[in-house]
């Protein structure tokens, strides 16, 4: 199955082809969705996903790197110890929103300020990642989770690089960051500490702190895109010939905090 096939199955995108979906980027919006924490051990840190919306063609989907199955043997212990396989999944935005409304968890949307070329590259990357041979990955709380996967996918398909402008003099350890979210879940704390080992009390940099969804949300709000420059020809690479530009063009709660 591919992204295009999923869109054709779940929307009113009649008459569309793969080429038409990938090539018509002008009115497509790509957003980062940050979700509040839940009550289960696997949702204590919150969640991150990517929304791709094109109302004119009836497309509104969510790309989600947080899919898993409870059928995995010893799921909770494996999750706590970072030994769980996760999958990338795609769902409709309406279904995604309904789930978080039911669980009474807030969702914050940040619309990304991307060029048509960047949006096209991102959708093609999503399509590749959605192939059966690429869809599964080994989840890790700190270095390979739903938030870092979304961040890295976006960063890899930007015509330049993301500059994080978050000014901070605080560099908490992984242990401190985790315990701020797991104070009432001792087994989760134990598993996190065991997984980190000697790294647990080392100070973290901005990139490492972004394993927490709310930290990435904050950093995206202040981030800019530094456009690539061809120094030999003294030309700017990118459709808008503008550098820097804000990474986020608009942000709002689509489900408010309860």
Where do the model's predicted regions map?
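Bacterial Sec-dependent N-terminal signal peptides
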Residues: 1-19
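Soluble extramembrane regions of membrane proteins in the secretory/endomembrane system
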Residues: 16-258
């Amino acid at each position: 199955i591919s992204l295009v096939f999923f869109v054709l199955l779940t929307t009113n995108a009649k008459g569309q082809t793969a080429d038409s979906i990938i090539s018509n980027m002008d009115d497509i919006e790509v957003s980062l969705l940050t979700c509040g924490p839940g009550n289960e051990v696997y949702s204590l840190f919150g969640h991150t996903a990517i929304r791709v919306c094109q109302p004119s063609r009836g497309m509104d989907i969510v790309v989600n790197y947080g899919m898993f199955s409870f059928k995995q043997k010893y799921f909770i212990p494996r999750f706590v110890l970072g030994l769980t396989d996760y999958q990338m999944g795609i769902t409709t935005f309406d279904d995604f929103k309904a789930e978080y409304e039911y669980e009474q968890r807030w969702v914050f949307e940040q619309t990304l300020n991307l060029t048509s070329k960047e949006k096209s590259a991102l959708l093609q990357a999503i399509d590749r990642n959605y192939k059966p041979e690429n869809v599964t990955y080994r989840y890790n709380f700190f270095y390979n989770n739903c938030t870092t996967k979304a961040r890295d996918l976006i960063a890899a398909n930007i015509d330049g690089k993301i500059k994080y402008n978050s000014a901070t003099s605080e560099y908490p350890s992984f242990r401190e960051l985790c315990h701020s979210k797991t104070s009432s879940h001792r087994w989760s704390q134990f598993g996190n500490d065991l997984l980190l080992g000697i790294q647990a009390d080392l100070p973290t940099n901005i990139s490492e702190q972004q394993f927490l969804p709310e930290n990435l949300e904050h950093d995206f709000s202040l981030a800019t895109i530094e456009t690539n420059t061809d120094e030999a020809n003294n030309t700017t690479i990118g459709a808008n010939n503008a550098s820097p530009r804000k990474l986020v063009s608009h942000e709002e709660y689509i489900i408010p905090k309860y």
